[in-house]
Amino acid sequence: MGMSGSSGLVHVLMLLLLLSILFHHTESTLPSDSEQLSITGRRMMANYKPNTAVETPPSRSRRGGGGQNTGAD
């Protein structure tokens, strides 16, 4: 299964060309840093609820020890 030198070179060049096109395409579709920060800020503020209690789920644990020593002296 031998590969001639020029055929191998063509395959390598095609691979590099595809990778460069893919990299350039994904880079151009990503938002810039300032846009990304703006989007992140909007998402965080959408979850912000002023003047509301902190939501905590009910405890699933049994009765806590409360720091009391249960062993005999």
UniProtKB/Swiss-Prot annotation:
Record keywords, A-Z: Apoplast, Cell membrane, Cleavage on pair of basic residues, Membrane, Secreted, Signal
Signal peptide span: 1-28
Locus of motif SxS motif essential for MIK2 binding: 59-61
Keyword Secreted among record annotations: yes
Residue span of motif SCOOP motif: 53-67
Biological-process GO terms, alphabetical: response to insect; response to wounding
Localization in the cell: Cell membrane; Secreted, Extracellular space, Apoplast
Region (Disordered): 48-73
Up-regulation conditions: Accumulates upon infection by generalist herbivores such as Spodoptera littoralis.
GO terms assigned for molecular function: LRR domain binding; receptor serine/threonine kinase binding
Primary location: membrane
Subunit text: Interacts with MIK2 (via extracellular leucine-rich repeat domain); this interaction triggers the formation of complex between MIK2 and the BAK1/SERK3 and SERK4 coreceptors, and subsequent BAK1 activation by phosphorylation.
Function, as annotated: Brassicaceae-specific phytocytokine (plant endogenous peptide released into the apoplast) perceived by MIK2 in a BAK1/SERK3 and SERK4 coreceptors-dependent manner, that modulates various physiological and antimicrobial processes including growth prevention and reactive oxygen species (ROS) response regulation.
Family: Belongs to the serine rich endogenous peptide (SCOOP) phytocytokine family.
Protein name from the UniProt record: Serine rich endogenous peptide 1
Name of encoding gene: PROSCOOP1
